[in-house]
UniProtKB/Swiss-Prot annotation:
It comes from Fagopyrum esculentum subsp. ancestrale (Wild buckwheat). DNA-dependent RNA polymerase catalyzes the transcription of DNA into RNA using the four ribonucleoside triphosphates as substrates. Keywords: Chloroplast, DNA-directed RNA polymerase, Metal-binding, Nucleotidyltransferase, Plastid, Transcription, Transferase, Zinc. It is found in: Plastid, Chloroplast. Zn(2+) binds at C224, C295, C302, C305. SUPFAM superfamilies: beta and beta-prime subunits of DNA dependent RNA-polymerase. The gene is rpoC2. This is DNA-directed RNA polymerase subunit beta''. GO terms for biological process: DNA-templated transcription.
Amino acid sequence: MEVLMAKGANLVFHNKVIDGIAMKRLISRFIDHFGMAYTSHILDQVKTLGFQQATATSISLGIDDLLTIPSKGWLVQDAEQQSFILEKQHHYGNIHAVEKLRQSIEIWYATSEHLRQEMNPNFRMTDPYNPVHMMSFSGARGNASQVHQLVGMRGLMSDPQGQMIDLPIQSNLREGLSLTEYIISCYGARKGVVDTAVRTSDAGYLTRRLVEVVQHVVVRRRDCGTTRGISVSPQTGTIPEILFIQTLIGRVLADDIYKGPRCIAARNQDIGVGLVNRLITFRVQTISIRTPFTCRSTSWICRLCYGRSPTHGDLVELGEAVGIIAGQSIGEPGTQLTLRTFHTGGVFTGGTAVHVRAPSNGKIKFNEDLVHPTRTRHGHPAFLCYIDLAVTIESEDIIHNVNIPPKSFLLVQKDQYVESEQVIAEIRAGTSTLNFKEKVRKHIYSDSQGEMHWSTDVDHAPEFTYGNVHLLPKTSHLWILAGRPHKSRVATRSLHKDQDQTNAHFLSVEQRYISNSSVINAYMRHTFFSSDLSSTNSNKGDSISDYSERKRIVRTRHSNLIYPAKNSYLLGKRRRNRFMTTFQSIQELEKELRAPSGISIDIPLNGSFRRNSILAYFDDPRYRRESAGITKYGTIEAHSIKKKEGLIEYRGVNEFRAKYQMQVDRFFFIPEEVHILPRSSAIMVRNNSIIGVDTQITLTTRSRVGGLVRVEKKKKKIGLKIFSGNIHFPGKTDKISRHRGILIPPGRGQTKLKNWSYVQRITPTKKRYFVLIRPAITYEITDGISLSTLFPQDLLQERDKVQLRVVNYILSGNGKPIRGISDTSIQLVRTCLVLNWDHDKKSSSIEESRASFVEVKTNDMMRDFLRIDLVKSTISYAGKRNDPSGSGLLSDNESDRMNPFYSIYIYSKARLQQPFSQNNETVRTLLNRTKEFQSFIILSSANCFRMGPFKGLKYYKELDPIIPIKNSSGPFGTSLQIANFYSFYRLITQDKILVTNYLQLDNLKQTFWVMKYYFIDDNRKIYNPDPVSNIVLNSFKLNWYCLHHNYYEETSARMGLGQFLCENVCLAKNGPRLKAGQVLIVQVDSVVIRAAKPYLATPGATVHGHYGEIIYEGDTLVTFIYEKSRSGDITQGLPKVEQVLEVRSLESISMNLERRIDAWNERITGILGLPWGFVVGAELTIVQSRISLVNKIQKVYRSQGVQIHNRHLEIIVHQITSKVLVSEDGMSNVFLPGELIGLLRAERTGRALEEVISYRAVLVGITRASLNTHSFISEASFQETARVLAKAALRGRIDWLKGLKENVVLGGKIPVGTGFKGLVHPSSQHKSIPLKNKKKNLFEGEINDILFYYREFFNIEFLCFKNYQ
């Protein structure tokens, strides 16, 4: 008894829980200390003890043991709330589909993980001896994931392809699944019997192919005599020390290791634990080890290249079938991991990013120059930092410094206040080159039918130049405008053109139909304020009241332009920015159009003028032409001050330069008729032919004048010009022949011309020419127009130093052609009003002035005036930031304190002929016809109204941006009023005076168009006052302000015609929130929006379809291409292993493998020359590929916790990389071009025949390698039996029966184990082949010396163990 006690005192007692890893270590130590037999006896006792304890405990699992986690309810509710917000953001067009998918995955994955983490503490606190808890953490077959599905939530599921299903299963198996959740679970969980068998058979088939390719690899020699090896370095730090030790143990050294002069390890010495510790202690830099890669045996392997046997720890025995062991070692974990995946149930596992949180409350400070704005993968705005960013959080008593690593997202702004534990940055996961990433295409389908529009330029995909596939160059929205195609069943000729607007009521009453190309727009009408808009549609059977005939479409880039048709129907339209008015005249207008006249005030958006700025312009009707032509300034060379250098632009204001102002008293206009026709037009006249008036030019066009025809063909269009005039064929002595391009005064020349003429030389052929004498129209420029003629004297009251002067200038350059469009008129000379002020001491510092229209209404009467204020540039402008008109809205006392202003008032004499009452909508002309010219502004009915007295402070409290308009309606209730050409500024003062400040919007500086407007009264009779000319209708931008006595102001969103609005935009305070759509009609009190749905798309996305194309529900709109990390599930891992071993895709083998191989081939061929370049290049290619393949396969298995020794992988990889392809017909008597042969065979054949064989390395998959072996019997038993046997018979192949399989098939003795002894001669076992005996061979000696003794010279990275893991 004492002896036993003494023995027990020396033993160490461990009171620890033994899990799987600890059990492995314990068994390993047992084998080292006691050997295999004694260890198996100990493990049998442990097994028996475990069975006895399990029987005694008798743990069973009941349904009541499944305890649901209490916090699950609010966690799921919170995730649903986030998903709802995410869906809203996607509906508004703020994030696109891929960002929504990513964020949804992370929301539910984080919820599921949180529940999983709560599970263990919940069990530990409530019931620590719960059988479910004990089983889940015992290390048995089940794991925490399965228990989590029982008591937590199943979460996101994968489909059979491994893609995530965007509908999480919120229930757990204890609560029970709904029908939808059950179907998703069955679909994605891969629990079917057939699918299970298929997945298991995949793993089994992989094992079969692996064994097939290496079944002949047997240890048959002791030493192959190679001096090659792979260098392993522990100092690189690229691999953990544990992996480094695992790689070394069991290997054999390929070279002696010295520490100084002392040899600490000899060549061919196997490495054990003691030697590894000694090498680490001495800090050896590089260790060269032998591997199956470097074995020189042709079809088997030697003991030293294989190393120790994994079973008993000594060198492997001769005759051991290491190939079959390797194939089973790689394939068997696949079957086990596949089964484990089935038990888990296909639950999707994502990854969450690492977040940086604020340590305390405070204000964020960082250097804004080191970051730039970007968009996160979830669509949130963020800053991206390229280098380490120091972020400071300043709280009241302490300053915290946080370092943000490079390539991270900063989620806060500078000077933002953050709270403790708030996420301030997101660290990107480290991108490894070995990560498996795949490009995924996600198609977005249309939810509704309508018309496709986009808000940016779109490029053609290069491979689909003529197709309907486009690429987006930048982030933008795709819009589907609501509408439905309406096909006509009645064969009637429609009066409606493409995209004309109509209303559904008219279609139902009149039973009219729209042509197939039209779309009925879906309208939503939003009324901002209380107003009674009455529609005046006529219901007569013969008349179409609210249609306008489309005369012609004018497209410009920046603005909407309108001009009238002859029957006074008005329509302006663009593809992207669309606008329509429905003015209609019941009776025909007078054919003689009155000369339109009027002054247009040109005030920029900010109301700011500099010296010599153009304040207003007036177009004299005498200088207006209806046809195209050329402007000539006479014989002297004169400049047009409309040129870029003559008229400079400063902040949207035109200014004159004095040196370009020239005196031109007379200019000439040479008229011509111009037609711009499409390239495909059929022209019925010839070039250089003479035609008469009303000649048919094309199928639809006739000439208005007669004369010479000139046709110019361009890329896409044909220009056809008709020159009127006389043709003169000059003689040799004719003076006219000497002149061309000149003007001839009347009475000169032989023909005695009555008027000025323009001589133009025409050369139809090289030898003949003639002269065309064209009539020229003379225009005299007089200085008779002055301020007194433009304005009555009582309108001008100049004050102080402000000066206004009248300047005339010609709009086109000398000799430049002027092309008219359709029925528009061309203005040749423009009279402008130039603003200036004196240069005295007081006004020397004044560089800018502010101008604004103001209309004051008192006692039910209106007066208009223009106010100009001079501003000193030394004092900063003190107006409100969003108030372009500036201090014009401030009181005099306030403005005087701010700045000494100088003002000029120009009063208008426009009077309303009768006061308006609240219910009287009859409108009379607003003109004073006794004057020669009219006032600045014409107002329509909706702008002329009477306001009742204010009731207390009611309006001050509501702060409505616009005063309600009583009973106002424009023509038909839907047209644009003229007042919409201006931004409104309304001022409510304590004196109850309404001041409306008009600021005209004018962004066009080159082209002006004539438009005519008509007013309508209650009796629906239309009459025409003097039309307004030269009003520019651009995309309307309305800015609403409301001010009262304490200068409170409010700004709402700007809105333009054709603009796309996202959902939930509010344009006025207390106004309705708009739906998404495109603005069609803008009024003072309402806006008409066509419903639309936005889809956000990122750069590089592919858009399907053309602009303006009809899209039906379910059509593909856009395709996203994004990178996605493949799931870590082994069901995705096994296909990856198979893909690598079958060499299906070079990209998945190594992302930069091709580049490295090409670089090596170039360098080696350049250094060694062409003959050796083939050999060495192939060698380098093979070594690079082998290391990359081993790393890839090991990464997959290590991610699943499976440890496979590198030697097994090396034997497999050695077989699939040991083939080369004969590339040239250099040795036609031995090998054929394109034949697959072994690398060693090619080298030995080349040495024997003393010729160079040109070959290149190829990677063959395991299936192809199994069909290209030395044994046709082995190939025939694997696949394609008939083909293999037929080819072997034709070639007369001989099978030497070296492998296992062919001997099994024929019933012979297999050459392994005891059967190996009779096949090997004793003399060959111990025969050594040292390197010195082969020095006579140039290739073997020199190449080995160069490559393996002078590695530093070549910097051969493939021999280092940087990536060898």
